[in-house]
Amino acid sequence: MARTGGGTRADGRATAEQVVMAAERLFAERGVEAVSLREVAKAATSRNTGVAHYHFGGKEGLVRAIVARRAPVLNCRRAALLEAARNRSAALARPVPAEDLVRVLIVPLIEELDHGGHYVGFLARLAAERHRAPWVAELDDSSTASFREVSALLARRLPGLDRRRFRHRRDLLVQLVVGTLAARGNAEASGSGAPGMGPRADFTEDLLEAAVGLMLAPTGPDNRDPRRPGQPK
């Protein structure tokens, strides 16, 4: 019996989806540069070793497809959190505090731990490799609309940071969060955990507090608190 054009297209979409899922896992485990498209095809159980190139044109297209599949969910969640933060602040007749904006940035990523999968690990690999491959710098979650919007709001709440300093801290924030989440996710997935790994709620709150501290820390020696350990008297 001949297959219909609709059936062929559906099969093609299913194959492409399998390739994307396999690539996300392999890239999260080993890094984008270390994985070949042939390995992706094999992991997707495809006998066609060129299937990734056929559907996505190459590794860059495949990475973009992973982001296109995952980023909209994070984008919508972050937009919802921003709206809620704005509503709370409007009721108090004040701007959204910088602390709340930092949380809006990263809570959707933290929630990925509840969904399983490998996207946070994938983002951690992208963050680590972005300086070696120029096109990678445009592909992580920071390219989504809600991330840019919240980042712009946060920059205005932190006038003590010039543009360069703000971008540097934001990049450090992304690396800290996705790297820590990837390590936590791997530890939880192993079933054995890690030495000293506490409850998820404590982990989440500690990560949020660390993120807020990173973005809101004062700059320059004149702004250091002399009571802090390790600072000159």
Task: Please give the residue ranges for each predicted region.
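An amphipathic alpha-helix adjacent to DNA-recognition modules
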Residues: A16-M21, E33, F56-E83
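Short hydrophobic clusters on alpha-helical segments that form packing/core surfaces
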Residues: V19-F27, A211
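Helix-turn-helix
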Residues: L26, E33-G61, A65
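Hydrophobic alpha-helical connector segments
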Residues: A79-Y119
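Short alpha-helical scaffolding segments that buttress acidic/His motifs in well-ordered protein cores
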Residues: L105-L109, L123-A127, L173, V177, ...
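C-terminal peripheral helix-coil segments that are non-catalytic and often amphipathic
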Residues: T144-K233
